[in-house]
Amino acid sequence: MDGMLTEGTSAIPPPQPPLEPIERPPTPPPLPPDESALPPPPTDPAPPPPPPDSLAPPPPPEDVPRSTYTVPVVVKKKKVGWGSSKSTTPLSVEELLRKKKEADEAASRPKFLTKSQREKLALEKRAKEIEHERRIRAASTNGSMMSDSNGGGGNSNGRASPTTRYDNVNGSSRTSIPTAPRALRGEIPTAPAAMRSSQAKNNDPRPGNKVPSDSAATGEKRTAPEDAQALLTRQRYMGADQTSSFSAKKKRRRTTERKFNFEWNADEDTSPDYNPLYQNRSEMNFFGRGRLAGFSDDVVDSAAKRYAKALEDRDLEAGSARAREILEMERRRREEGGRNGLDLHWSQKRLDQMRERDWRIFKEDFNISTKGGSIPNPMRSWGESGLPKRLLEIIDKVGYKDPSPIQRAAIPIALQNRDLIGVAVTGSGKTAAFLLPLLVYIAELPRLDEFEWRKSDGPYAIILAPTRELAQQIENEARKFCNPLGFNVVSIVGGHSLEEQSFSLRNGAEIIIATPGRLVDCIERRILVLSQCCYVIMDEADRMIDLGFEEPVNKILDALPVSNEKPDTEEAEDARAMSQHLGGKDRYRQTMMYTATMPSAVERIARKYLRRPAIVTIGNIGEAVDTVEQRVEFISGEDKRKKRLADILASGEFRPPIIVFVNIKRNCDAVARDIKQMGYSSVTLHGSKTQEQREAALASVRNGNTDVLVATDLAGRGIDVPDVSLVVNFNMATNIESYTHRIGRTGRAGKSGVAITFLGNEDADVMYDLKQMLMKSSISRVPEELRKHEAAQSKPTKAGGGQKRLDEGGMSAPKTGSGW
């Protein structure tokens, strides 16, 4: 054999195709197997495994002629080591790059095969698959025959023992009990039967080459029930597998397979050129943005003219008439603003062009929010208010140019005889908002001087105010409108004698402005009756409750006649039903309430005496106006605060008048004396002053004779001092509502103002609310001391079951009933 494997083997001719495999001597036949347990025998005998490379090929058999026997060609491996020489010349880089480039080009170029070549490759591939399956089948047959010949797990008589039957769970024994579905019973064993039994007994699997099964050979993936259950459990708790199964080589159905293709191209269509009307008609709609593609009116007009000319050229008779109609429509469209004015601002539209969207934008611009049923839209100007012409002339003469937000929303509602709750910040024009509808209401009633008995039946309307100063201020404002109309207005407040006020009522009065306490005294002394009162207005209702006037207010409202009371039904929201006269003369009573905050006591009064009220809110409840800049300084001690006040007044930044607020009466005179020592004139205003002293102090400040007004919370509500540039809280208010009304004395009527507050540790109860108010203001800043203070981090809890602390003066009202 060594001579056959010498270096002369290169001269041997190429090998010929192999002949039939060599027949081996026959082996004794095994026991007849169970045909139902064994796979079918192969049709062709399986060839023996090839010999390893290290062994020499076997000699030719004696019974085969030498001429037909072909010696397999074996290429001798070159020996490396002793007596061999290794090539030391490496390949150059250029040659490697050239070879790589050629290989890439060859791989990138498509290889075209003929039909015969493709069929040949397919046949070769199929032959390899068949050969592979045949080898697998032969290996499984040989393994089962070897296990039977060795008597694996059987008795001497060839039968399997009972123990072996139940031990061979994997199906290696042909007599074992089936433990799997029929489709999985024929899996190929992984080892001989003797080894399987020993492995199962010792529970020690031995490593080895696993023979692939039929399912693996055919490419099918079978999943055991246990594996499927484990997969579902893993997906349930760990989520679905994120690995994508997308394959670019996967054959997909083309979406254009069933698409019908015409024999002619779309570019060959000449029909648009036939009619000139469709050439450039709609090309503008696809460019730009806006009302009509963002083009100006000139472009739109030119397009309309071009379209009209095309119509005339097409048809001289009917086309000319149609062209004139189109030009007329375009002219009307330009006059109306296009698409009924959708592209115009609400201030440029007519009233009939206003839509729901425009009214919503209008309310957002003025920060108006309404609540209730059947509420009319607000008015945009005095001309759209619906007021009588005579009253509009007086408004123009007084100098009211544009209505304020509360006037825009409240006047149209009040003109429909609806009960109203107006929630607005201080200095927003609430006085005119309830005076003008009141004058329209009483103008339709009989005059008091028509009959003598009407004068003794009392007024048509009463206006309640919490303080004397506010009542007199409302009286002065009402006289501007009532005197030209011939109505009589009388104020009934404390500080004046009852005889003087009784003399003022001798000729009757259509409108009475009073404080709750003095009005109750007049009713109890039979000086005044409310037999024909049909209009009630409560201004600063929350302030009246804070001053302890809840019980007097209830007495006044209970003294009103019940014959003209509104029903608590949906009719109270019907403007036409509420405008009717009862019995031909009387009208339904109308009640209005204006407030800056809504405490529970005010809600109780509103629930008891108002019928289906419309609620109008301007801004946010309890917030200061945006025209006031709030500044907070931490200063403890009276001396330091007085020194800081002197620096503020001496800075020259603020022009008089200036208001300084303190908490207690005795501090007013002390602070006023210190201000006079600084070189500024000052007056005081508090509850211990007489009515004449109060009026004189306010008059001196309004006339410009006094620079600084030092006051308690008495001046914090409703007192209108024009052009106040600065408010100084020498002592912080005891609650945030009083603070809101204090700083509301400045920044009124749209003007700007500044409020400076001196804060100390004794004001811990209001620090949280003060911090929240400063954060909501767009022009104010929260100081670091207040931001980091412990009391400003959470809202304090009220002691005593939430009882609200009242301001100075007044009597406490019993808190009965539930909130509204």
UniProtKB/Swiss-Prot annotation:
Stretches assigned to the Helicase C-terminal domain: 627-790
Positions of region (Disordered): 1-70, 101-255, 784-820
Catalyzed reactions: ATP + H2O = ADP + phosphate + H(+)
Short sequence motif DEAD box: positions: 539-542
Biased composition (Basic and acidic residues): 116-136
UniProt short sequence motif Q motif, positions renumbered to this chain: 380-408
Gene Ontology CC terms: cytoplasm; nucleus
Comp. bias (Pro residues): 12-62
Keyword Manganese: no
Biased composition (Polar residues): 159-178
InterPro entries found in the cross-reference section: DEAD/DEAH_box_helicase_dom, Helicase_ATP-bd, Helicase_C-like, P-loop_NTPase, RNA-helicase_DEAD-box_CS, RNA_helicase_DEAD_Q_motif
SUBUNIT field: Component of the U5 snRNP complex.
Matching PANTHER family: ATP-DEPENDENT RNA HELICASE DBP3 (PTHR47958)
The name this protein goes by in its record: Pre-mRNA-splicing ATP-dependent RNA helicase PRP28
